[in-house]
Curated annotation (Swiss-Prot):
A motif (Prevents secretion from ER) lies at residues 666-669. InterPro entries: ATPase_NBD, BIP_NBD, Heat_shock_70_CS, HSP70_C_sf, HSP70_peptide-bd_sf, Hsp_70_fam. Residues 646-669 are annotated as: Disordered. One of its GO terms (biological process) is protein refolding. Induction: By dithiothreitol-induced endoplasmic reticulum (ER) stress response. Induced by tunicamycin-induced ER stress response. GO terms for molecular function: ATP binding; ATP hydrolysis activity; ATP-dependent protein folding chaperone; heat shock protein binding; protein folding chaperone. Functions as a chaperone during endoplasmic reticulum (ER) stress response. This is Heat shock 70 kDa protein BIP3.
Amino acid sequence: MARGATWTRRLHLHGLFLAVLLLLTLPAGSTAAAGGGGGTVIGIDLGTTYSCVGVYRNGHVEIIANDQGNRITPSWVAFTGGGERLIGEAAKNQAAANPGRTVYDAKRLIGRRFADAEVQRDMRLLPFAVVDKGGKPHVRVEVRGGDVRLLSPEEVSAMVLARMKETAEAYLGEEVTRAVVTVPAYFNDAQRQATKDAATIAGLAVERILNEPTAAALAYGVGKEGAGGKNVLVFDLGGGTFDVSVLAIDGGVYEVLATNGDTHLGGEDFDQRVMEHFVELVRRKHGRDIAGDARALGKLRRECERAKRALSIQHQVRVEVESLFDGVDLSEPLSRARFEELNNDLFRKTMAPVRKAMADARLSNADIDEIVLVGGSTRIPKVRQLLRDYFGGKQPNQGVNPDEAVAYGAAIQANIVGGDTDNKTRDMVVLDVTPLTLGLETAGGVMATLIPRNTPVPTKRAQLFSTYKDKQTTVTVKVFEGERSMTRDNRLLGRFDLAGIAPAPRGAPQIEVAFEVDADGILSVSAADRATGRSERITISGDDRKTSREEIDRMLGEAEEFADEDRRHRERAGARNSLEAYVYGVKNAVVGGEMAGAMDGGEKEKVEAAVMEAYEWLDGNQDVGKEEYEEKLRELEDVCNPVMSAVYQRSGGSRRDGDGGGDDDHDEL
């Protein structure tokens, strides 16, 4: 269902600018991923609070469980006092005891300016330090003893993506270098590009950036190609972001009609309201302000999230935190009604994007055939009720797992762009749209629209401008996104100068400015002087938010450094475990075990002394290197193995040296 290329020309005046509009919509099929090499392409849902990875194999999607057996992984990274890096459940589980070195919510910072209001608001709520570096927010964290680093949101996200990559590799038994990565539909260019940079740092070539609601629609629609055309509304309310997309699905073609949302609304905002409620309650009851106590807030945050989840199936829960501060325990009830009251305005805020998306799609409520819920926050009964009421009692579709739908759809898209399609995915086509209007500033600060919101992508549109002063030799192109008529009310994406224009009366030069949005939703802008042929071109990602090639290379180096450090920690832990297993095995064999009665006094005393010395050495050497543990194991084996071998030979046994603690035991462990 490729769209034919069409050109439209219009002539009009923008203040003191002369403009000719050239409209071009590229064929949707022209952007099929060329493929970044061989190998399996995986689908990754990089979430604010949880991430998920899937692969399409043997005619169906497989959501891959992590090493803990869980199909979703917390998007958390931590650095311990011993210099170990933790990712996922391990990081989240120790957060209350290590708040300043546990990082989360990177998705709320990625691609943003440090000065953004959302960043400034989040900084007050996060227990770790967020600082300004080159106009971008960075996390200041001690990664190991005295080694303090400034980590960009891209680097933190890359650590989570790398864990998703490792999870897939362990499952597939092969190296993975290609992925489809999802982003909120309302992510802007800077946020999309920053997400691609994070994947690059993680060692992944991004075959496609896919909007999360579109991915969920793929998850809903796969296998239903013969069901006839349907209009589907995807309501995606996750941990940190909110999207609404309206799609027309017909015979394998998924056409996004409209999208809307809020990149800073989700389950964490609901948790924060509950936390603020209990912080105030503690202030009233105990006269103590814990708002600045990172450890107390860490404990409270975890319990408030648990309570929120429980209230989706219960009408009342008890919020209990042992030793919240100074030995004082918190044990208070929280009803579903109170939870809904605390978040009432936020819940109702989700309906505005629904109304806007429906209006942009030019559909009535009765035109929607299915409502697909995505994101853990859609389990909240009040959210479902508001959505049900808006659509006149229509029940949402229950066939898609809200936690896994986005990764499921990403895996389908990964199969498509990887070229390994089957009869289920071969004819699937995704036609997505731009979420916001794109334009540039003209005389007087007026916004000149080049690409209206909800324009199908990929697309390219061009417009002719001229100078507004006599003999003007340089023009500045300022690129904005937003729906307001004046650029001061919209978001500046980037700017560049086109110099070397031949001096001429104002209005005479012809300067063609072209906007091009690719299938990933990333905008490129070019400007060319038709008289001289001079041109400039940039990929918009916000100059003050754009990650340079040098920065990416540095981050790649640090990622390898962290990976090496992780490997050393694993090897050190393995060596210590081997030593401990041998010590415990020998002890069990000698003290009350089968060998106890077969040893003479001198042999038993010698082995027991060696074991006791090893116990003491282990207690005093918690963090030595792999080599020290291996050397200590060799020393202990040199003492114990000959004795135990001799005992077995005397007793007619045939076990080889070392079986008393034996190599088999510690290999299995």
